[in-house]
Regions:
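Ribonuclease/tRNase effector modules and their secretory precursors
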Residues: 1-85
Length: 85
């Protein structure tokens, strides 16, 4: 998790983001190769995340709670309009 995530969103800790990543409920890959995901943190909050995976390394460069409508719509579109949370 990049430090800038917590700097921009002090309501999220690194532990919150890692917990949300480990409990992803819905995800989709963008054409760019970046992944979008929504997971549940340890406090029961839905967290939107953007990340890239390179081999065994995952870099989460964006996280926000609660997920925005725009974020959810994009995941729906990428997943073929299956409804997310």
């Amino acid at each position: 998790v990049l430090d800038r995530v917590m700097e921009r969103h002090p309501e999220l800790s690194e532990k919150d983001v890692v917990t949300a990543f480990r409990s992803v409920m819905v995800d989709a890959e963008r054409e760019s190769g970046a992944w979008m995901a929504i997971g549940l943190d340890g406090r029961g909050r839905n967290v939107e995340m953007l990340y890239r995976a390179v081999g065994d390394l995952v870099v989460i460069y964006h996280a926000f709670t609660p997920p925005t409508k725009k974020f959810r719509r994009e995941i729906d579109r990428l997943r073929g309009d299956r409804r997310t949370l």
